[in-house]
Amino acid sequence: MKKKWKPSASIKDLMKRSKIIADIRSFFLKKNIMEVETPILSQSGVTDVNLMPFITNYFSFNDNIKKKNLWLITSPEYHMKRLLSAGSGSIYQICRSFRNQEFGQYHNPEFTMLEWYQLSCSMEKMIEEIDFFFQKILNFNKADKISYQEVFMKFLKIDPLSTSLSELFQCYKKFNLKNLIYLENDLNQLIENIFTLQIQPFLGKEKPLFVYHFPSEQACLASINKKDSRVSERFEIFFKGIELGNGFHELTDYFEQRKRFIKDNRKRCDMNLPEQKIDDYFLDAIHHGLPTCSGVAIGLDRLIMIALNKNSIDQVMSFSFERS
């Protein structure tokens, strides 16, 4: 008899997972940061070209209610920022998130996210807060920090803030990656891909590493640095070559955020991807007034995987995608 009915992780490891999550909740309780719950189903998708949301629909036998498309959240970010705009104060959430076309050693279409927003907090201060969190909850060593520009110079001898297409083509050729050049004129996409393939696997080998000041073209929902408009107030966290989290000093400019969403959808068209419905509730919340804050989204399954010295996230999940 096949044993796929059994959990992906051992009961012993699931008990350890439960303890870590309890410790996380205790950490935030002591800091007087409110835990919140927000919808899993959203009336809008996300425009980020790197995210593929699941879509479903609502319908009723009542003729007055028409069939309605709904999206499973890729993160609770938009709803949590609506709470921030409504005056919630600093908040966190542990919840399920969903991303299509993502399955493997470090990916599962359904996964657990820790999302945390801290009011009146700079990017630098947020990095310190997260570093302390890792040390306190998981006994990690104090993290290192390096800028996106510095890490490119260290590994590839390329300045990502001033590089050219020809220089990047040579770099792709050097690493036998020319077959991955599918948008030849998209400088930013080439930079992102080479970072993922030739830099990320070597990051944070001994202890966590924060890479900060991502190029402004990769700002997503982060603000732009006031001293250097070429870079954003965005950072990512890596440990043992694995991305653990993505954080921002949050963008609070309604007009800039709307412009970025529109630009995302244009890029989706260029990549033959479906456009996504822009979340007007979220934009209205920013227009009302998103307070100055920083936030981070941490993949909890990956974090627990590293803490328990496992090789893949299915070893710390009760039932992975293949056993769901």
Swiss-Prot record:
ATP binds at residues 99-101, 108, 243-244, 299. GO terms for biological process: lysyl-tRNA aminoacylation. GO terms for cellular component: cytosol. It comes from the Bacteria. It catalyses: D-beta-lysine + L-lysyl-[protein] + ATP = N(6)-((3R)-3,6-diaminohexanoyl)-L-lysyl-[protein] + AMP + diphosphate + H(+). The keyword 4Fe-4S does not apply. Substrate binds at residues 75-77, 117, 250. Belongs to the class-II aminoacyl-tRNA synthetase family. EpmA subfamily. Disulfide bonds: none annotated. Homodimer. Keywords: ATP-binding, Ligase, Nucleotide-binding. With EpmB is involved in the beta-lysylation step of the post-translational modification of translation elongation factor P (EF-P). Catalyzes the ATP-dependent activation of (R)-beta-lysine produced by EpmB, forming a lysyl-adenylate, from which the beta-lysyl moiety is then transferred to the epsilon-amino group of a conserved specific lysine residue in EF-P. InterPro entries: Aa-tRNA-synt_II, aa-tRNA-synth_II, aa-tRNA-synth_II/BPL/LPL, EpmA. Its EC number is 6.3.2.-. Pfam families: tRNA-synt_2 (PF00152). This is Elongation factor P--(R)-beta-lysine ligase. It comes from Buchnera aphidicola subsp. Schizaphis graminum (strain Sg). The gene is epmA. One of its GO terms (molecular function) is acid-ammonia (or amide) ligase activity.
